[in-house]
Regions:
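Glycine/aspartate-rich loop-and-adjacent alpha/beta segment that forms the canonical ThDP
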Residues: 25-61, 66-68, 303-432
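Alpha-helix initiation and N-capping motif
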Residues: 61, 85-89, 98, 102, ...
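Residue-level detector of short coil/turn "hinge" positions at structural boundaries
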Residues: 75, 115, 125, 282, ...
Length: 432
């Protein structure tokens, strides 16, 4: 059964009020002065004789599209995507694996075994809901809290843990901070820390794909509500709209930009309201509902492949601390965290949905959690034993052919280490 959401796609009666999904805001009422329309190149709009300043209250709020309620029940059967069993189980097992990896690697950092970590608690539904609706050939520009997308696409726990430990098998050669993953094989562009830099890059990549004859790929760009406050976000939105790029802009609005709540980040109706203002089809979705996210991204991908950019604001809650460098209880009450953990868990919602379909039970849950935990523990123990990359990796593989300036530095470093090797833990690194 085809999904139909949006102005010409909504068929759910209870969501008639949500007819702006993947479209534009309700326009404020205007009084036409004789039907005269302006001919200004900057805006073709009707003339009025009554002056009126518009604000955030001049428009209806963009509604939140959802498929499941808090208990994992389908609200309207017509919106159930009816995903096949194998895909549903892959989605759920990915969420469980991610949760176990987060728990163990977070504690690993606390024990001093890795330098840094960021968890994904509360946002797992956004990861698997979106990943399951994309083609593996679609290009991913992520921020730093989308690991579930990588797991769903086939990146292994070994690859992810090696990256966090920065050993010689780290695909990034030990050059990045932990959780800054990337994989050319899985069409995932390497993560960088500065907020929002990936947004105009993603749109540029989408523009390049658009120019490929018979293109069948789109780009999805993940970013948070904090990144949406950066100037690069506006540039990316406008770039995508004016050049009709095949891109999905996926905002994870989890309520906090480190310690800054959304109430201090913006006025108006959230991040989603910026889409219609710039001419981008927009939908706001319940990010704790993996099925709703799947539906939204599946339809958004269809639009993107027709060179119609889409903005999705996935509403969620960051259950964990921003990172291991943060203590979120200093700026939000513990009761708030507990409420969201108990009542709006994306993992729990999907598990209850699977149980009602007869795809899951308590024994399967116990076995899945055990296997996920054992995989991470075993991989972590192996990663710790591996040596760090050869020191020459600092200088190699930067240019295709090493320029004389870098060759000179390498020679100097080599002589220095020969002379002062006792001052460096060279046994911990690979050597020739």
């Amino acid at each position: 059964m085809a999904l139909r959401i949006g102005v010409s796609f909504v068929r759910l009666n209870s969501l008639r009020h949500a007819a702006r999904l993947l479209s534009t805001h309700t326009r404020p009422e205007v009084f036409n002065n004789g039907g005269s329309i302006s001919d200004f190149p900057g805006a073709r709009a009707p003339y009025v004789t009554e002056m009126k300043f518009l604000n955030e209250n001049s428009y209806d709020l963009i509604p939140i599209y959802r498929v499941m309620d808090k208990n994992g029940d389908i609200i309207d059967s017509r919106e159930d995507p009816n995903i096949d069993k194998d895909t549903l189980l892959h989605m759920y097992k990915t969420m469980v694996q991610l949760s176990q990896m987060d728990k163990i690697l977070y504690e690993s950092q606390r024990q001093g075994r890795i330098s840094f970590y960021m968890t994904n608690y509360g946002e797992e539904g956004i990861h698997v809901g979106s990943a399951s609706a994309l083609s593996h050939r679609d290009l991913v520009f992520a921020q730093y809290r989308e690991v579930g997308v990588f797991l769903y696409r086939g990146m292994t726990i070994t690859e992810l843990v090696n990256q966090c430990y920065g050993n010689y098998e780290d695909p990034g050669k030990g050059r990045q901070m932990p959780v800054h993953y990337g994989s050319k094989q899985h069409n995932i562009v390497t993560i960088s820390s500065p907020l929002a830099t990936q947004m105009p890059q993603a749109v540029g990549a989408a523009y390049a794909l658009k120019r490929v004859p018979n293109n069948d790929r789109c780009v999805i760009c993940y970013f948070g509500d904090g990144a949406a406050s950066e100037g690069d976000a506006h540039a990316a939105f406008n770039f995508a709209a004016t050049l009709d790029c095949p891109v999905i802009m996926m905002c994870r609005n989890n309520g906090y930009a480190i310690s800054t709540p959304t109430s201090e980040q913006y006025r108006g109706d959230g991040v989603a309201s910026r889409g219609p203002a710039l001419g981008i089809r927009t939908v706001r979705v319940d990010g704790t509902d993996a099925l709703a996210v799947h539906n939204a991204v599946r339809r958004a991908r269809e639009l993107a492949l027709d060179n119609k950019p889409v903005l999705i604001e996935a509403m969620s809650y960051r259950v964990g601390h921003h990172s291991t460098s943060d203590d979120s209880t200093a700026y939000r009450p513990v009761e708030e965290i507990q409420k969201w953990t108990k009542e709006e868990s994306p993992i729990q919602k999907l598990r209850l949905y699977l149980e009602r379909k007869g795809f899951w039970d308590a024994d399967a849950e116990k076995q899945c959690v055990k296997e996920a935990r054992d995989t991470v523990v075993r991989t972590m123990q192996e990663a710790e034993k591996k040596k760090r990359p050869h020191w020459k990796e600092m200088l190699e593989d930067v240019y295709y052919d090493m320029p004389p300036s870098l060759q000179k530095q390498m020679n100097q470093m080599e002589k220095h280490l020969e002379k002062h090797s006792e001052h460096y833990p060279l046994s911990q690194y690979q050597h020739e």
